[in-house]
Amino acid sequence: MMHVLAFVGASGSGKTTLIEHLIRLFKERGMQVSTVKNSHHSVEIDHPGKDSWRMKQAGSFEVVLVSDRSMSLQRTFERTSHMSIHEVIAQMYDGVDWIFV
């Protein structure tokens, strides 16, 4: 069963530091943790001109960057409004034990 825990506080109050510690602690206990970080800015992983950027610009719904040790998934939603946290979580992998927001 997946659990969701939200952290709320002023900037600089230690939310990220606490989350880092909890991720390590939960991982040591064999649990998988995902995180959601809200940003007030557009999220850009790619660099203009790179293949993955070009695929996204062409209209690909998902672009997956894969290397020997990692995978990064970027989805593009054509939305006019901000996604609710419930909508975000519904799009995430459901095989984790905890999601920290």
State what each model feature region is.
Residues M1, G59-S60, D94-G95:
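Short loop/turn elements that form and flank the Walker-type P-loop nucleotide-binding site
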Residues V4:
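Walker A (P-loop) ATP-phosphate-binding motif of ABC ATPase nucleotide-binding domains
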Residues S11:
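The conserved Walker
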